[in-house]
Amino acid sequence: MGAYRAEDDYDYLFKVVLTGDSGVGKSNLLSRFTRNDFSHDSRATIGVEFATRSIQCDDKIVKAQIWDTAGQERYRAITSAYYRGAVGALLVYDVTRHVTFENVERWLKELRDHTDANIVIMLVGNKADLRHLRAISTEEAKAFAERENTFFMETSALEAVNVDNAFTEVLTQIYRVVSKKALEAGDDPTTALPKGQMINVGGRDDISAVKKPGCCSA
C-alpha cells in the first residue's frame, strides 16, 4: 500500500530528522523503516546520511526524506544545515540508558532552536525489547512528552516493533496540518505545494488540534 514507489512518484516531500544521543539506535530505526534492515554491527554515523520512503495518506503519496546524524558532540557544527527545512523529528533515547533520556531535554531545545516552532516531534524510546535492562519507565517518558507537547512511542528496531508506526504517525500529522492549511486557504493541497517546496506547518494550535490516530498507510 504505497510502501516502496518510484522516486518521483509523490505528491508531498517532507524532511524528517532523527536526533538524540549516539548509540540509541537512530541509524537502525532509519534502516528498519526505509529498507526493513537491521545491523547488529551499527557503528556511529559519520557525518550525515539520509534515506527516503513513501507512504500513502488518503489518496496522496507522501515521500519522507529522513536525515540521520551521529549524536556525538564533535558533529555539532552541522546542526543548522541538518535541521533546516525539517517539518518532523524523531527524538530518540535508549530505554536502557537513563543518561540518554536525561539528555532529551537538551536535544529538544536544540531542535526547537533550529526549526520552526511548530515542527511535529515524536519522542521515541528505542530498544524496548531489552525489558530486563529497562531504566526509564513508559510512564516517566509519557509524562515528559505530554509536558513538552510532543508525541511519544516506544520502539524496537531489532524486533521491528512500532518503527513503522512512529514514522507514519509523524508523517500523518504533518500531512494533516498541511492539508488543513491548504483547505482553509481555499487551495488544492497538491497544487498549493509543488514538489520540493518548503513546507510551513503553521501554528501550534493546529498541531495540538490534530493529535489523533494516524490515517496514513505504510
Swiss-Prot record:
SUPFAM superfamilies: P-loop containing nucleoside triphosphate hydrolases. Belongs to the small GTPase superfamily. Rab family. A motif (Effector region) lies at residues 42-50. It is found in: Cell membrane. Intracellular vesicle trafficking and protein transport. GO terms for biological process: cell wall biogenesis; protein transport. Gene3D superfamilies: P-loop containing nucleotide triphosphate hydrolases. One of its GO terms (cellular component) is plasma membrane. One of its GO terms (molecular function) is GTP binding. This is Ras-related protein RABA1i. InterPro entries: P-loop_NTPase (IPR027417), Rab_GTPases_membrane_traffic (IPR050209), Small_GTP-bd (IPR005225), Small_GTPase (IPR001806). It is a lipid-anchor. It comes from the Eukaryota. GTP binds at residues 20-27, 68-72, 126-129, 156-157. It comes from Arabidopsis thaliana. The keyword Ligase does not apply. NCBIfam families: small_GTP (TIGR00231). The gene is RABA1I. SMART domains: RAB, RAN, RAS, RHO. Keywords: Cell membrane, GTP-binding, Lipoprotein, Membrane, Nucleotide-binding, Prenylation, Protein transport, Transport. A lipid is attached at residues 215-216 (S-geranylgeranyl cysteine).
